[in-house]
Amino acid sequence: MNKVFIIGVCLFIVSQAVLAVPWDSDESSDERLSDRSDESREEPRKLVVSDDDSREDSNESAEVRRRDDSRESEEEPRKLSADTSDEDSDDSQESPLDLFFKTLRDSKISRAQRAALLKALLSRYAGY
């Protein structure tokens, strides 16, 4: 009885945290993309440099930034492909709690679907 109560309390706390978090990450990523595109549309800034040495330093730092940006853009698709391959592999061997948290990480699930999923878990494990 004590374990059931603890599991119920834990699931309730998780449910409150999950329902309180805005899961509209698609909109925020669209905003970030539009911000980046606005930045790229701006005219390039002209640097007025008196020394040739400082000009070389600024060119080197710009090259380093470009390399870092290209690395980040290359790493993101790799992470996404790794995540999708893990999900497709062995869904039948995962516990219901693993499926629950994996589903919660999916940004396309609605608030009502999260609540229904949580209710199903509570009814199965806590007897509510």
Curated annotation (Swiss-Prot):
<dbReference type="GO" id="GO:0005902">
    <property type="term" value="C:microvillus"/>
</dbReference>
<dbReference type="GO" id="GO:0006874">
    <property type="term" value="P:intracellular calcium ion homeostasis"/>
</dbReference>
<feature type="region of interest" description="Disordered">
    <location>
        <begin position="23"/>
        <end position="95"/>
    </location>
</feature>
<dbReference type="GO" id="GO:0031215">
    <property type="term" value="P:shell calcification"/>
</dbReference>
<feature type="compositionally biased region" description="Acidic residues">
    <location>
        <begin position="84"/>
        <end position="93"/>
    </location>
</feature>
<dbReference type="GO" id="GO:0045178">
    <property type="term" value="C:basal part of cell"/>
</dbReference>
<keyword id="KW-0732">Signal</keyword>
<feature type="signal peptide">
    <location>
        <begin position="1"/>
        <end position="20"/>
    </location>
</feature>
<dbReference type="GO" id="GO:0009725">
    <property type="term" value="P:response to hormone"/>
</dbReference>
<feature type="compositionally biased region" description="Basic and acidic residues">
    <location>
        <begin position="30"/>
        <end position="49"/>
    </location>
</feature>
<dbReference type="GO" id="GO:0048589">
    <property type="term" value="P:developmental growth"/>
</dbReference>
<keyword id="KW-0091">Biomineralization</keyword>
<comment type="function">
    <text>Plays a role in cuticle calcification. May induce precipitation of the calcium stored in the posterior caeca as calcium carbonate.</text>
</comment>
<keyword id="KW-0964">Secreted</keyword>
<keyword id="KW-0106">Calcium</keyword>
<dbReference type="GO" id="GO:0005509">
    <property type="term" value="F:calcium ion binding"/>
</dbReference>
<feature type="compositionally biased region" description="Basic and acidic residues">
    <location>
        <begin position="56"/>
        <end position="81"/>
    </location>
</feature>
<dbReference type="GO" id="GO:0005615">
    <property type="term" value="C:extracellular space"/>
</dbReference>
<protein>
    <recommendedName>
        <fullName>Orchestin</fullName>
    </recommendedName>
</protein>
